[in-house]
């Protein structure tokens, strides 16, 4: 029947804690989480694994979502050892004045997270993560935008 045929074709869930690679003793995974509940659940699952520290590189998705859920994002990153925010991936939306990746930084630091930073320039993201991650750590690239492209770049640089 058609349902069974389609199930056979299903390739599985992509961008849910996908292992991208390991280099220099650092493991890098990629995850699509972009809503506060998904973010918290992904970080909680990562913390249950055997890593020294969990670093989240998060790219906010859509200006409207940032504005709508900004308060809920405050606690979503609580269990991460460090959080690095990129600028917003617009997904075709027009920018909203005053809403940037720094909006997330402010919400999370106001909520009490001691190790959160905003890296506004994409070119600076991989060098920043190289400074933060150490052998035995896990880095999660997270978000619904093009942050997924950073994960293999990070693995390449960690391996040099």
Model regions and ranges:
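Nucleotide phosphate-binding/pyrophosphate-handling subdomain across enzymes
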Residues: 1-82, 106
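C-terminal helical cap/extension that packs against the catalytic core
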Residues: 74-135
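Short, flexible loop segments at boundaries between secondary-structure elements
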Residues: 85, 156-160
């Amino acid at each position: 029947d058609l349902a069974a045929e389609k199930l056979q074709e299903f390739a599985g869930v992509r961008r849910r804690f996908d292992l991208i690679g390991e280099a220099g003793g650092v493991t890098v995974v990629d995850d699509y989480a972009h809503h506060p509940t998904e973010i918290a659940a992904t970080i909680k699952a990562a913390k249950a694994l055997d890593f020294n520290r969990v670093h989240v590189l998060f790219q906010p998705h859509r200006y409207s979502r940032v504005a709508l859920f900004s308060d809920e994002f405050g606690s979503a990153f609580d269990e991460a050892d460090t959080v690095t925010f990129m600028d917003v991936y617009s997904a075709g939306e027009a920018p909203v004045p005053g809403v940037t990746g720094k909006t997330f930084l402010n919400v999370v630091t106001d909520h009490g997270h001691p190790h959160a930073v905003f890296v506004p320039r994409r070119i600076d993201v991989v060098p920043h993560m190289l400074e933060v991650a150490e052998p035995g750590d896990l880095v999660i690239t997270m978000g619904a935008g093009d942050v997924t492209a950073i994960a293999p770049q990070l693995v390449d640089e960690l391996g040099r």
